[in-house]
């Protein structure tokens, strides 16, 4: 194999040791909190039929630009999942799950984007979906779940909740007319993407990060001016619920989310510490998605959190167990070391023994200089059923009877 192929594919990253422990800590914490809220863990394949994701919307960047599509050997159109929600909806429908139901999932997703800090082509998400409730209380519960995760990661004071309400269909229809009327005056000044969206999905322009678009949007009509009474009441209940939980928020009427299936409540938890990739958790309602994919009409709300972005923010150091290294001296001691290592590991002791053909005791001790405890034994120790236990931090060394070794080590590693 060519040397230049022995590297990570652009937009992907190997995870080793401490960084992987950070990921696992976040995922484990999320699953623990999910369980408190009554979520069931599920796992879906990373490949799905392409049609599963086309319901994301033909105007979304994910569908038009970012999906990894290919034909398998049977000629089927297959896609590496770019997000979880559509795959979870597919699972809900195909398994005929009883609603209401809350589903938790996590794992890698894939998007063909320009790689940059905290934005890779393969990245990891924790994902929460709640199917079967059209109550604003469900929205409050899901947002509070996000806040719960951030609080336990000690990030709640460094992240801002931005929330918007897209309204009911009557609200959206009325708002689109006035928004398009306003934007048509500046059509030639809009970015290329926004000129295209003006025709197919004008609401997506509100989410533009283009400087020229942002300037134009400053004086654009606000969707809140077109809320029906039902929309006003629903949004008020959501905000009252957040106030009741003392969860601070900022209303941002430009949040529409990047996927076409969102409706009513949409939200993002953002930070100023990650540059342009400022969204850490994002989600909202998608009451029409299940029906559009062939299921029954099912109200739903969900969100996803980027593990890489959370990992970049948290202050976490994996507490590694104390390492115990074996240094057998001689062939008989080496044979005994195999048995000793196995027995200690079965009792929960972390034993490191990689050098099966040791050199001198001096060299082996030098190699073990950065470890915690060393067990030394040769012919003399085998005959007396003892082991030399050396604390590499203090230099203390003592002979310990084999029958007392486990208790001795457990006392040292606590």
UniProtKB/Swiss-Prot annotation:
InterPro entries: aa-tRNA-synth_II, aa-tRNA-synth_II/BPL/LPL, Anticodon-bd, Anticodon-bd_dom_sf, His-tRNA-ligase, HisRS-like_core, HisRS/HisZ. Gene3D superfamilies: Anticodon-binding domain, Bira Bifunctional Protein, Domain 2. Transmembrane segments: none annotated. Keywords: Aminoacyl-tRNA synthetase, ATP-binding, Cytoplasm, Ligase, Nucleotide-binding, Protein biosynthesis. GO terms for molecular function: ATP binding; histidine-tRNA ligase activity. It comes from the Bacteria. One of its GO terms (biological process) is histidyl-tRNA aminoacylation. Signal peptide: none annotated. Pfam families: HGTP_anticodon, tRNA-synt_His. Its EC number is 6.1.1.21. It is found in: Cytoplasm. CDD domains: HisRS-like_core. It is an enzyme of class 6 (ligase). It catalyses: tRNA(His) + L-histidine + ATP = L-histidyl-tRNA(His) + AMP + diphosphate + H(+). Coiled coil: none annotated. Its main location: cytoplasm. One of its GO terms (cellular component) is cytoplasm. Homodimer. Belongs to the class-II aminoacyl-tRNA synthetase family. HAMAP family: His_tRNA_synth. PANTHER family: HISTIDINE--TRNA LIGASE, MITOCHONDRIAL-RELATED, HISTIDYL-TRNA SYNTHETASE. This is Histidine--tRNA ligase. It comes from Ehrlichia ruminantium (strain Gardel). The lineage of its organism: Bacteria, Pseudomonadati, Pseudomonadota, Alphaproteobacteria, Rickettsiales. The gene is hisS.
């Amino acid at each position: 194999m060519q040397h230049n192929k022995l590297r990570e594919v652009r937009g992907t990253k190997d995870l080793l040791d401490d960084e992987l422990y950070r990921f696992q800590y976040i995922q484990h914490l999320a699953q623990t909190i999910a369980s408190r809220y009554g979520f069931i863990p599920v796992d879906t394949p990373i490949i799905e039929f392409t049609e599963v994701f086309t319901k994301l919307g033909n105007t979304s960047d994910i569908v038009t630009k970012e999906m990894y599509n290919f034909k398998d050997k049977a000629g089927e159109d297959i896609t590496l999942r770019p997000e979880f929600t559509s795959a979870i909806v597919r699972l809900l429908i195909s398994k005929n799950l009883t609603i209401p139901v809350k589903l938790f999932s996590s794992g890698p997703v894939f998007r063909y984007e320009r790689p940059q800090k905290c934005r890779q082509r393969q990245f990891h998400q924790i994902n929460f979906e709640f199917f079967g409730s059209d109550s604003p209380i469900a929205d409050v519960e899901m947002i509070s779940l996000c806040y719960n995760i951030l609080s336990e990661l000690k990030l709640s004071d460094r992240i801002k909740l931005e929330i918007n309400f897209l309204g009911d269909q009557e609200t959206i229809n009325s708002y689109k007319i006035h928004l398009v009327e306003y934007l048509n005056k500046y059509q030639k000044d809009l970015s290329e993407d926004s000129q295209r969206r003006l025709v197919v999905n004008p609401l997506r322009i509100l989410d533009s990060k283009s400087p020229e678009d942002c300037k134009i949007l400053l004086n654009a009509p606000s969707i809140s001016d077109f809320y029906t009474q039902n929309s006003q009441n629903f949004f008020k209940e959501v905000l009252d619920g957040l106030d009741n939980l003392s969860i601070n928020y900022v209303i941002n009427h430009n949040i529409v989310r990047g996927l076409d299936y969102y409706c009513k409540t949409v939200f993002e938890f953002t930070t100023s510490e990650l540059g342009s990739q400022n969204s850490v958790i994002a989600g909202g309602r998608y009451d029409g998605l299940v029906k559009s994919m062939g299921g029954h009409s099912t109200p739903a709300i969900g969100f996803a959190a980027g593990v890489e972005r959370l990992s970049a923010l948290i202050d976490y150091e994996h507490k590694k167990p104390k390492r115990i290294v074996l240094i057998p001296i001689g062939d008989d001691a080496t044979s005994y070391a195999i048995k000793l290592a196995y027995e200690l590991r079965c009792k929960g002791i972390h034993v490191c023994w990689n050098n099966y053909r040791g050199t001198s005791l001096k060299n082996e001790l030098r190699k073990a200089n950065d470890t915690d405890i060393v067990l030394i034994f040769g012919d003399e120790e085998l005959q007396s059923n003892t082991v030399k236990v050396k604390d590499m931090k203090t230099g203390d060394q003592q002979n310990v009877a084999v029958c007392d070794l486990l208790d001795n080590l457990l006392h040292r590693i606590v």
